[in-house]
């Protein structure tokens, strides 16, 4: 495995993300809307019932963690499918690039995509709802690491199922 090839593929996807304002807006907009929506729903429940007093923090934390898992899996899948849809796979395999190098570059790019959506969501929860996810400390890092690995694994599983079910459509 060559680092230069992995870095080149990473840069290709990174430039596709950063040079397109709609892509960046999509990565930031939906997590922010989800946090705002679940925050206000949680506040409504907490203000109308004593049973849900501590639900705001739990629901917002779960929404952020779920969104990170979802963004990681979707980010990995979309990057791979964009290679297929743009008919770039032939070009990739003409070059001396191995499957492992492609997957590693997609893994790192999926992390960047997930972080672009995660950071604004975490920053919104503190001023709007008084919930800080960073209070979990080092446990938060390990939780995000596990969610990230599960999201990538889920992405690989979904892509393999897509490839098994429709191998001829992906190639054309």
Region locations from a protein language model:
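Hydrophobic transmembrane alpha-helices and immediately adjacent juxtamembrane helices
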Residues: 1-165, 169
């Amino acid at each position: 495995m060559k680092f230069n090839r992995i870095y080149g593929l990473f840069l290709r996807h990174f430039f596709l993300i950063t040079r397109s304002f709609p892509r960046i807006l999509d990565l930031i907009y939906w997590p922010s809307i989800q946090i705002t929506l679940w925050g206000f729903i949680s506040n409504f429940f907490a203000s109308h019932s004593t049973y849900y007093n501590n639900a705001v923090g739990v629901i917002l934390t779960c929404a952020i963690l779920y969104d990170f898992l979802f963004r990681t899996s979707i980010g990995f899948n979309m990057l791979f499918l964009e290679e297929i849809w743009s008919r770039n796979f032939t070009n990739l395999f003409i070059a001396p690039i191995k499957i492992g190098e492609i997957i590693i570059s997609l893994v790192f790019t999926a992390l960047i995509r997930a972080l672009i959506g995660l950071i604004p969501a975490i920053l919104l929860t503190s001023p709007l709802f008084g919930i800080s996810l960073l209070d979990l400390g080092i446990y938060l890092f390990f939780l995000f690491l596990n969610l990230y690995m599960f999201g990538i694994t889920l992405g690989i599983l979904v892509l393999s199922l897509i490839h098994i079910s429709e191998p001829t459509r992906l190639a054309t």
